[in-house]
Amino acid sequence: MPKTSFASLRLLALMSASVGVLAMAAPAMAEDEAVEAVVVTAPRYVPNGETTASKSQTPLVEVPQSVTVISRDQIDLLDWSTLGQVVRYTAGVTGENYGPDQRVDWLTVRGFNPVQYIDGLQAAVGSISNTGLDLYGSESVEVLKGPSSVLYGSTPPGGIVNITSRRPEDKFGGEIEVQGGNFDHKQFNFDVTGPLGDSVAARFTGLYRDKGSQIDGVDAQRIYIAPAVTFRPTDATRITLLSYFQSDDVKGDSRGFLPTSGTLTANPLGRTSSHTNLGEKTYNRFQRDHGAVGYDVEHKLGDGLSIQQNLKVTHLESDDRGLFASSVLADNRTVSRYSFSFGENVDVFAVDTRVKYRGDTGALRHDLVAGLDYRRYDYVGSSAFVFGSPNTDLFNPVQGLKITAPPLVVFSDQLQKQTGLYLQDQIKLDKWIATLAVRHDWVETTNRMAAGAKVEDKEFSYRAGLSYLFDNGLVPYVAYSKSFQPVAGSTFSGALFKPTTGEQYEAGVKFDARGLPPGVKLFATLAAFNLTQQNVSTPDAAHTGFSIQTGEVEVKGLEAEVVGRINERVSFNASYTYTDSEVTKSNGPDLGNRLPMTPKHKVSALVDYTFQDGPFAGFGASFGGRYTSETAGNLLGAFAPVIYQNVAVTLWDASVHYDLNDWKLAVTASNLFDKEYVASCSPAANCFYGTRRVVTASIARKF
């Protein structure tokens, strides 16, 4: 490891230790400092309330599962707008795996790609498991780590990511903001909420962004709006109508596809710039529209009993076309290219109805949820793939060619219906909490390209956990959980594939600030886990070209995470992740391989300080660092005879901000020292530079 990496690690370790010292010193600081005039800039920096992890009223500290909640205040601190950005300081999660992408977010959670949910219901995801939803309209982002099928049905074993939308508030308020930055970044956004009467409140959020990229010739526009209304016809009834619409138009983006020669490996003619665009600026284009309408209704029946229903109708359509690098020829500079076009139409209808009960039976306290959910997923995908597109020069790309888009051919036309019935009871006896949950799913998948051929799957999921609540806020827990995901395909004999299954054992400790002085807000989690995925497809040694489901993947790890805030002055985040992933059973060459984009080590720490009095009152600054160890870019396979190892990297972030009355000025910088690095390489022409330095200045008027 280079000396600079050791130095970066030492500095990160010092920062993490400093955060630990802050956490331990918090009680003394809270008692010693008498805060008179407080400039409240991030009152909800530290999460402590309910989450989608339990679909109940259970506090986060009492949920026997590792869950990270990134609050709106955390998102605002460093001006994050994508899921890849918000998980930079989160344990167990890696983001921005393929560098800057104007379309979607690339994440791994405990080694697997998570599925995106919005307000507790699955989003209209297509071939990629998220929609690229802009986070300006979100109140928080929740990462549920580990199998979550017991409450959400078919999900990956690594977990899910849920985005919670901003909701109407009874008090009038909002903001208008203008931003500008490098790469021609220009943005205007607004958020306004308030009462429309005694029992009605509304919210309207919107954004327009026009920006380029570190890749030459890229121009991306985004429009986002999100109206919402809440009705309270009675004290016992709340009806919230939620909606959003987002439109993206990205021109000229080659997605950063570059050959390994000149990026990860040496090229005798020199190094390829991270600004290189090997596509065709006038031809490459990505367009997407997606939106949703729905509601969240809750009615309290009395005596601890309530009923709640979430419903959402979502539509997504996208068109993508471009020229992309294929390989470097013998002269080390001529690059062959291919043309790829892709389109998707996705419609999702999802509804989740649950009855909640909180009450006592003798010495036992129950927090019970019984629910029925249904999801209808309609997907049509089409593509065109053509080799023999005009070559270009690696170091002086040719632009201005006229390219004719090939006609699209439908490759997938399917309808999937999933119905789930679930029951969970969190039983409290004195300071003990037992969490028991069970679910049964019925999944029907219809392939409309095969004369309506249907596949029906049935699956049980379970979760069991045990926690103990100490008076000082310390909560140790153990838990077991299962997950499943349907798989398309069949064996040589014609037997349909079974769903893949996930199984996890987890033990950990959580801590909140209930035992600390009022000025201290703190939440910490330490978790160890062993996660196994089974029924993984692997080559059938007896029948070439076919697969059988005898493969297995195992992921073991340790995650530590803390977020805190002291006397409205100091905010901090720190995390450490150790992940050991391996393909433990396979008939292919990937046996023993580590999972792609799953580093063994990830360390991060961030500290922000805001002055509360004196001549600098309202002024604040933050500084953070994040280290990711080397990762594998791919598994070995028929089209990937070599594993490309992505090098370890340390990046730094910073911000300065100033609050004066109702105005806020801020400057944020990610990758502060503009480190050029390769984020990922898989096959020989699939290398992606990581995100270079991004600087954004903003001025906001709050009201």
Task: Name every feature range the model reports, one short phrase each.
Residues 209-213, 223-300, 315-346, 389-418, ...:
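Acidic/polar loop-and-plug regions of large Gram-negative outer-membrane beta-barrel proteins
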Residues 230-234, 346, 365-369, 373-377, ...:
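Structural signature of Gram-negative outer-membrane beta-barrels, strongest in the C-terminal barrel
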Residues 293-316, 338-448:
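Face-selective signature of the C-terminal outer-membrane beta-barrel domain
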Residues 572, 626-638, 657-703:
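C-terminal beta-signal and adjacent terminal beta-strands/loops
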Residues 33-171, 507:
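Acidic, small-polar-rich N-terminal luminal/periplasmic segments of exported/outer-membrane proteins
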